[in-house]
Amino acid sequence: MKDVILIANAGSSSLKISIFGIQNKKVKDKIYNIFLEKNNNKILFYINQKQESAISIKDNAIEMMINLFEEWWTKQSALNLIATGHRIVHGGKNFNKPVIVNEKIIKELRVLIPLSPLHQPYNLQVLDLFFQKYKDISHIICFDTSFHYTNPPITKAFGLPKQYYDKGIMRYGFHGLSYQYVSSHFKEITMEDLPTKTIIAHLGSGSSLCAIKNGLSLTSSMGFSVLDGVMMATRTGNLDPGVVLYLINHEKMTMKEITELLYKKSGLLGISGESSDMRTLITNNSHDSKFAVELFVYRIVLEIGKLIAALEGIDCIIFTAGIGQNSAVIREMISGKLSWLGIKIDYGKNQKNEHRISTKGSKVKVFVVPTNEELIIAEEVMKFL
């Protein structure tokens, strides 16, 4: 039998599972890429991008996804599951590194649900189901916030009374697993050392940027929640708190309506009125679509300026995630607005998504490095085995 580990990443309507083979206590290869999603009234089940089945939703969707996976898993007699790894969005103040799951930790993480209400419940539901079904193996949690634990206090504090900071109302930062992968695998991918003062731009449906100094997170664009920072596919990004007060007092909106507005109806979708997909907006000639793209780029450029100030300089910018690693147009637009830094992009290399897309004469190096959150979780799991 072949020893494998399972990596789970759960969303509100989907579940991604990666099965990695291991050899000599190292992650060897990805054997299966499994994706389950809720689509209308059905759950669709994909293995290595091929649809295997579709079943009607009769009960809790996440539980049905796990059961559907387990039904398939029982037929994989050649594979021996020795551990699972799980992405948990929020680790709060106390979880600054991966941990082995037990009942006490699950209870502690449930307390953090108010800090990440749209992600944490589903992360924990999947974790708990695997923990209950596979009692004889280790289950390891990796947190999206842990990478930013090195941020100094000055970067974490809001201008609120200290009592709120003590209660955990502070800047945390997210997408940490992506930043950890890109920074730790940078040399093997690019054949260059990670420059001292680096900004990584994780640009996807959820987007953020991180200032990294000497390989460690210094600060990032996201703060208390995944709403903060740059504008995203359906999220607002930075927003004057007075806007929320106005929506409550004058628009008479409920908390549920405001949550829906800020998380699901804003960003690229809200500005364009057409789509949350950057690929669609780039090819659309409407005024609102163009404005949405321009605003997305503008907010990113402003954030890069803030992070350069925090770093007290800049040596390198790295683009990653769905938009960052695939959209030559967005990279060119951002780099163009940063030309005052002495950034020069090689048009041909940028179009081909090559790893280094800046010219030799560019004063700031610019790279494209695909992220791999599942692999970094798998590598963390192996440290416990």
Curated annotation (Swiss-Prot):
InterPro entries: Ac/propionate_kinase (IPR004372), Aliphatic_acid_kin_short-chain (IPR000890), Aliphatic_acid_kinase_CS (IPR023865), ATPase_NBD (IPR043129). Its main location: cytoplasm. This is Acetate kinase. Substrate binds at R87. It comes from the Bacteria. GO terms for molecular function: acetate kinase activity; ATP binding; magnesium ion binding. It comes from Rickettsia typhi (strain ATCC VR-144 / Wilmington). Pathway: Metabolic intermediate biosynthesis; acetyl-CoA biosynthesis; acetyl-CoA from acetate: step 1/2. Catalyzes the formation of acetyl phosphate from acetate and ATP. Can also catalyze the reverse reaction. The lineage of its organism: Bacteria, Pseudomonadati, Pseudomonadota, Alphaproteobacteria, Rickettsiales. Belongs to the acetokinase family. GO terms for biological process: acetate metabolic process; acetyl-CoA biosynthetic process. Its EC number is 2.7.2.1. Its cofactor is Mg(2+); Mn(2+). Mg(2+). Can also accept Mn(2+). Homodimer. It catalyses: acetate + ATP = acetyl phosphate + ADP. SUPFAM superfamilies: Actin-like ATPase domain.
